[in-house]
From Swiss-Prot:
Domain of life: Eukaryota
Assembly behavior: Associates with the telomerase holoenzyme complex. Interacts with DKC1, XRCC6 and COIL.
Effect caused by changing K335A: Abolishes binding to telomeric 5'-TTAGGG-3' motif. Confers binding to the non-telomeric 5'-GTGAGT-3' motif
Name of the protein described by the UniProt record: Homeobox-containing protein 1
Organism lineage string: Eukaryota, Metazoa, Chordata, Craniata, Vertebrata
This protein's encoding gene: HMBOX1
Length: 420
């Protein structure tokens, strides 16, 4: 065996000179083999043993094996062939698909005698190489295969149930969910942490107050509901995974949830940027009515879409204006007006000028970032205004007030002199 090792090494080096192309699965398998501590000689010896065992199986059961050659010392394409074969078997275990005919062997169930031969084969490998543990590896591979099948079936079952809930009456489902939360004693705050939807939004939706949840968030909520019903307590330790803002896949169906990853991946909305044409339309409607109803918001959204619509081109979901975005813009606009009014009132009061307080804004003007993911870049930046620019703005208002105060004092003195 040692005498054939230089020949095998030369053949392996010839493969490097030919620059073989390996798949990702093959590279992953090779890296995992190397991390186990096996040397090249041990790997080649194990592959030769597997070839011999496969040949014995094919001779015993009358089945032809296409494992890529009978010996690694006489073939010039043994290393890539063995890697391809290992890859094909791995793909068969994880995906349940039959490998390609060019680099596979028969994966059909063997008779009961195969198990006996398998135990003998494992004993042979164990005695020839102390670092290998074929029995343990075989058990792990079978566990991975069964788990992947169960996870996929469970995920498909959850998706079907979510689609069924989407077709049902929303009010009936809300009552079911409220009863479910009460019976399990699950707080809305915990649900908000898991799903990424704000607690206030969940509360308003369950109480049938305010606007309805978007289709994306409703699917996410129903998915959590189904997972929690199937496996109680499994989702409570999960947290929503962060999603890049530039990811355009938020409008697609949510990705499958992995029970082992510890995260509940939900697609979040991308920040919406208003165009100048739409802002002009929004301002005109805002001057008419600052609190439009749902029908009016739909009218405003259609007007904005008509302005930005190009002939022969359909607006994408990222470009289309919806009633929810209109609601968000109006709420931010009202907040901005009241914020500036509060600043001016505070400055006037600091100079002893009594003014009527503009009052606190209503709860309807509060727009939670988690409630409405499509934010307005033209107005939301005011909530995080730079302190320096705010100080300059306040100083300008202060200067104007002082100028008016001096002008009023001069007029009073002039009137007093005229009376004398």
């Amino acid at each position: 065996m040692l005498s054939s090792f230089p020949v095998v090494l030369l053949e392996t080096m010839s493969h490097y000179t030919d620059e073989p192309r390996f798949t990702i699965e093959q590279i992953d398998l090779l890296q995992r083999l190397r991390r186990t501590g096996m040397t090249k000689h041990e790997i080649l010896h194990a592959l030769e043993t597997l070839d011999r065992l496969d040949q014995e199986h094919s001779d015993k059961f009358g089945r032809r094996s296409s494992y890529g050659g009978s010996s690694y010392g006489n073939s010039t394409n043994n290393v890539p062939a063995s890697s391809s074969t290992a890859t094909a078997s791995t793909q068969t275990q994880h995906s349940g698909m039959s490998p390609s005919p060019s680099n596979s062997y028969d994966t059909s169930p063997q008779p009961c005698t195969t198990n006996q031969n398998g135990r003998e084969n494992n004993e042979r490998l164990s005695t020839s190489n102390g670092k290998m543990s074929p029995t343990r590896y075989h058990a792990n591979s079978m566990g991975q295969r069964s788990y992947s099948f169960e996870a996929s079936e469970e995920d498909l079952d959850v998706d079907d149930k979510v689609e069924e809930l989407m077709r049902r009456d929303s009010s009936v489902i809300k009552e079911e969910i409220k009863a479910f939360l009460a019976n399990r004693r699950i707080s809305q705050a915990v649900v908000a942490q898991v799903t990424g939807i704000s607690q206030s939004r969940i509360s308003h939706w369950l109480l049938q107050q305010g606007s309805d949840l978007s289709e994306q968030k409703k699917r996410a909520f129903y998915r959590w509901y189904q997972l929690e019903k199937t496996n109680p307590g499994a989702t409570l330790s999960m947290r929503p995974a962060p999603i890049p803002i530039e990811d355009p896949e938020w409008r697609q169906t949510p990705p499958p949830v992995s029970a082992t990853s510890g995260t509940f991946r939900l697609r979040r909305g991308s920040r919406f940027t208003w165009r100048k044409e739409c802002l002009a339309v929004m301002e005109s409607y805002f001057n008419e009515n600052q609190y439009p109803d749902e029908a009016k918001r739909e009218e405003i959204a259609n007007a904005c879409n008509a302005v930005i619509q190009k002939p022969g081109k359909k607006l994408s979901d990222l470009e289309r204006v919806t009633s929810l975005k209109v609601y968000n813009w109006f709420a931010n606009r009202r907040k901005e007006i009241k914020r500036r009014a509060n600043i001016e009132a505070a400055i006037l009061e600091s100079h002893g000028i009594d003014v009527q307080s503009p009052g606190g804004h209503s709860n309807s003007d509060d727009v939670d970032g988690n409630d409405y993911s499509e934010q307005d870049d033209s107005t939301s930046h005011s909530d995080h205004q730079d302190p320096i620019s705010l100080a300059v703005e306040m100083a300008a208002v202060n200067h104007t007030i002082l100028a008016l105060a001096r002008q009023g004092a001069n007029e009073i003195k002039t009137e007093a002199l005229d009376d004398d």
